[in-house]
Regions:
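TPR alpha-solenoid repeat register
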Residues: 33, 67, 87, 104, ...
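Residue at a conserved register position within TPR or TPR-like alpha-solenoid repeats
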Residues: 7, 41, 95, 129-130
Length: 143
């Protein structure tokens, strides 16, 4: 995947796309490869294709979390988690741009449940209130 990133950085998007598709033939659940293909599609302004790749990457991560019974925080700051969050943010963007704001809000909610600190600013994408100002959210602490 590092070599593919070098190709993209060097302006060889078509070759990079072919390499990623070849990689997915052997490992269709490679979250990072789908995220990268989504980024290439987004660069080509193909929102539907980008949504497909970002959505598949997000689904891979979500299913892994569900199978693991993950509860609590999954911080973005850990490198192993970053592709999931980046794919989710890009998916929410694509969904919003395609007029699917309810689905975009569901993606944002999942990301915020995983890391409430919101390091990628997904809350701002849909004007989702911060937890402390949300109805039923934690009360502010005087101190």
């Amino acid at each position: 995947l590092e070599e593919v990133q070098k190709m993209i950085d060097g302006g060889e998007a078509e070759i990079a796309r072919d390499e990623l598709l070849w990689l997915l033939n052997g490992c269709s659940d490679c979250l990072v490869a789908h995220r990268m293909l989504g980024e290439l599609a987004l660069a080509d302004q193909d929102l539907r294709l980008a949504r497909g790749h970002f959505g598949y990457a997000f689904e891979i991560g979500s299913k892994a979390l569900d199978r693991a019974g993950a509860k609590g925080n999954m911080p973005y700051r850990l490198p192993a988690n970053q592709a999931f969050f980046e794919a989710g943010k890009a998916l929410a963007y694509c969904l919003r741009e395609l007029g699917k704001s309810v689905l975009a809000a569901e993606v944002v909610a999942r990301l915020l449940a995983c890391d409430p600190s919101d390091p990628l600013g997904v809350r701002n994408m849909l004007d989702v209130p911060a937890p402390e100002s949300a109805p039923g959210g934690p009360a502010p602490v005087d101190g």
